[in-house]
């Protein structure tokens, strides 16, 4: 109606301060009378959550652009002032960025990072702004290493090329968790009008508050990760050939440097994908989890060079995919099993006193394989699970470190790995080098990664997983589907399914409502959240199935796992006759 159009035009007038290219896009929409598109751009503001922001680059309050970056940073800055007072001006923040860009709107990660830095500087806050593209894990590393109040990483990770994001780290070096997300969100809403100096990125050329941490952090990071290098002699002499792709992202130079730090033979780089390119021209989606479509060029290079392992980072290099002998897929849970086993074996070699094992911890998210739990039970260290997302593992790791515990490893099935505690987030750069050393060590014993995985399952029990997702853009459909699971056959009261695929359901945990039938008081131990959907079913055959919504994509994800006793070789029978009856596959 007329009121809505007037409101939209009011937002449009506010936009005239913005980037000229963004303004031109909006003017074109106004001249064309494209009310629906204007409503999509200006109708609802992006929600700031624990994952920060992630949306398409373009005009309007629902998109990533100069103005929304300024508004977000103003709110974040005000919240930091509230939390740290004058300490913020003494300690400062770090800002990093990836290589994303959107020429039609004039937006890019570098420009957004510069604007964020300008906002902080306008309030007298020292800013450590990386002078060039950097992997996401370098930002939390910088927060911890430099003792800063916070960090910002401008990246959309593995999202489609038109997207960008704004990821936030707290002073403890981990991603933010509640209540910080709500506090920042409220502060953003209270500081929407741009401050006079917020647009002035010319200050970056002369402000004494601006520092470039690039060289220092680069040097310290590679020095620090060498504590995970335990077989330098084998690395130097190994003839193993490894292919690496950065999928048009930032990872190439950093992974090459990591291999060099470990004295590993440099991995063969996929030439067509090694340089940063915001168009991601060789892939439909820049997500190495998608498998063959993203790794076709890697497999071809491996075949040409006789390489036995393929490693792939996502565009911001915080995640890692591994393929053994070209096309044998080692899924996220399996690489988690291999890296967890490897990190523990290396720790044992340097810590022969078995009494210290009681202070060792490993973590994984609740939807990831429980293989670490099986290893922990046999070896005597501690295993804990957290809610989905590395923000929870990073914060729990910090709590344990503050109690003088040792966190050796954490992982999530979505190809995220934290080896050690120098970076309290997933880190695909260090994980690539550690995977390279593990590959070289095993090759010296004429063993492949796949063979070692089998050996792990033989010793600790087979853990067979199948995870996937359904695309759904309609929130009402998603809500109705989960409501049906909560009122199965009974609309009047809560009633979950009692069986699936002929297998009895023995327990239900609903982290949306906080219900857990396994607990004496029926209350879940893990934190619950009514704003996200997540239900886990346990089955009489030892299977577990979880359904949840994604926090960053229009997906309903499912995760299924079956565990067998150590030495049980009938994994394929188990897999096909029982696992496939889990709800995600029906």
Language-model-detected regions and their locations in the chain:
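An N-terminal, well-structured beta->alpha segment
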Residues: 6-116, 207-237, 250
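Gly/Ser/Thr-enriched, mixed-charge loops and adjacent short helices
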Residues: 17, 37-46, 164-302
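Conserved phosphate/anionic-ligand binding catalytic regions in large, soluble enzymes, centered on
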Residues: 42-62, 156-159, 242, 246-258, ...
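Short glycine-rich phosphate-binding loop at a beta-alpha junction
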Residues: 87-98, 241-244, 360-366
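N-terminal small/polar loop signature for handling phosphorylated ligands or for N-terminal nucleophile
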Residues: 94-163, 258-322
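Glycine-rich phosphate-binding loop plus the immediately following alpha-helix
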Residues: 169-199, 333-360, 364-378, 428, ...
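Phosphate-binding and adjacent anionic-ligand microenvironments
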Residues: 303, 307-309, 313, 323-324, ...
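Intrinsically disordered, low-complexity linker/propeptide segments enriched in Ser/Thr/Gly/Pro
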Residues: 569-586
